[in-house]
Design a protein with these regions (language model features):
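Short alpha-helical Gxxx[C/S/T] motif in the catalytic ATP-binding
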Residues: 123, 127
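Conserved glycine-rich
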Residues: 72, 135-136
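Conserved micro-motifs of the catalytic ATP-binding
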Residues: 11-15, 47-50
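Acidic ATP/Mg2+-coordinating residue in the GHKL
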Residues: 91
Length: 181
């Protein structure tokens, strides 16, 4: 749990944005998670400005959640819609009760069915934080035929991800703990 908490505090806001090939990043994750059955077909995508390591961590967390709480195969895709890059991670598990989805993006919150699986309750909070740093949006919902779908929507035509004053680690710890005690 301590490692997850430290990971939550290191949200990537200090990482420099760089040109990122999303297809390459996704293919690296497919390889990293072998032998997990991940279905991914690269599409023609532009390079985007992103914090590459943080983006990889974000998508890796979603794949890991699919592995732990969902069922194979995991479907991974990226496509352009209007001026947005949409990255989707979907599994074929049971999904999550709709009334729990929003709460799961808060630190230390776990779903009812996840209580039998070891975890910290920080995975989706880390995902949400990294999406916010990239000026993106995160949509999580149950798929029409079961399973859970997470869609990350990132702007394509931005100079670079959101620049905010980087809080110190102590500030982050205070902010995170204050809301939970």
């Amino acid at each position: 749990i301590l490692n997850q908490f430290i990971s939550f505090m290191r949200d990537g806001s200090d990482e420099e944005p760089q040109e990122t090939n999303v297809n390459t990043l996704l293919q690296e994750l497919v390889t990293q998670f072998k032998p997990l059955d991940i279905r991914f077909t690269p599409q023609e995508l532009p390079l985007i400005q992103a914090r590459s390591m943080s983006l990889k961590r974000l998508i890796g967390n979603l794949i890991n959640n699919s592995k732990r709480y969902g069922a194979e195969p995991v479907e991974l895709s990226a496509q352009i819609e209007q001026d947005r890059l949409l990255i989707k991670v979907a599994d074929h598990g049971e999904g999550i009760p709709e009334d729990q989805i929003e709460d799961l993006m808060q630190p230390f919150v776990r779903g009812n069915s996840a209580r039998t699986v070891q975890g910290s309750g920080l995975g989706l909070a880390i995902v949400k934080r990294i999406v916010d740093i990239h000026s993106g949006e995160l949509y999580i919902h149950n798929g029409p035929e079961g399973g859970l779908e997470a869609i990350i929507s990132l702007p394509i035509h931005q100079a670079e991800p959101e620049q905010t004053a980087t809080p110190t680690t102590l500030d982050k710890i205070r902010q995170s703990i204050t809301g939970h005690f």
